[in-house]
Amino acid sequence: MRSYTSAVDVATRRRASVRVAGPDARDHLQRLVSNDVDALQVGDACPALLLTAKARVIAPVVVWRRGEEDFLVLTEPELGETVRSLLVRMRLRAKCEIEPEEHESVLVFGGDVGFATDFPDAREALDAGLQPTVSDEELEARRVAAGVPRWGREIDDRVLPAEAGLEETHISFTKGCYPGQEPVARLHYRGHANRALRVLRLPAVPAYDAELVHDGKVVGRVTSAVPADGGALALAYVRTEVPDDAELAVG
C-alpha cells in the first residue's frame, strides 16, 4: 500500500469491510444497493444503502471499485456480518467471491488521498499510514455540524432514506431495480416524509431522545448533541410542517 505523509486533518474511522470480486461482482451489487454501481470507474466510490422491501435501512455502505471486477463494501463495524450475509444470501448464481477484509480506515479532511465517502469535505483512505490529528470528540462535533446521520443514532431499521436526508447522496433515481426502490421512488415523486433531520442550536446539551416541543406539542426528538460555543449543536428529527426558524423547546 502507498503511504501518505501529508494531510490537513485526519480522523480514525472504525469500519467493517466486505470484498466482492469476480465477473458478476458489479451486477450483483448493482441489483442490491440504492446507488449506481455501474457508473463507478476504477478508483471511484459512492455512498449507498441496503434497504428492506419497504425501504427501511438495513445498512449504510460505501462501495469502492478497486478494479474492474474487484469491489470493497465498507460499513459500520457492527454491521459487517449483516452486510456480508445479505450479499451471500442474495448471490444466487452470481459468479463472485464475498469475503470480509480487515483494513485501517481514516477520514482525510482537505486532502486528495483516498476515495469519495459519505462524510462532506472528507475522503476515506485505507491502510494509508496516516496518524490521526482529529480526536473522536472533534470528529463527532464535525459530524453533527455537517448533519451527517450515524447508524444507531439517526439511522436504524425504522428510518426512511428521505427522513435522514440521504436521497441526494445515497440514492440514484435513474438506475435499475433494487430492494426498496418502489417506496423510495413513490415518496420522492408523489409524497413527502413526515419528519426530517435538522441541525439545531440549543442552549445546553440535551439527553439522547429528548423531546422537542413547539406550540405545546411534541414535534421532534434529539438524536445526537455536542457542546458548541457555550451551548450545543444537535441533530434531531423534526416534523416537516414545523418552520425551519421555529423556536423549539427541549421537553
Spell out what each predicted region is:
Residues 1-5, 48-60, 92, 112-113, ...:
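Short amphipathic beta-strand starts and helix->beta connectors
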Residues 24-29, 80-84, 126-132, 206-210, ...:
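Short, conserved charged micro-motifs
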Residues 30-38, 79-81, 85-93, 189, ...:
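Short, intrinsically disordered, mixed-charge
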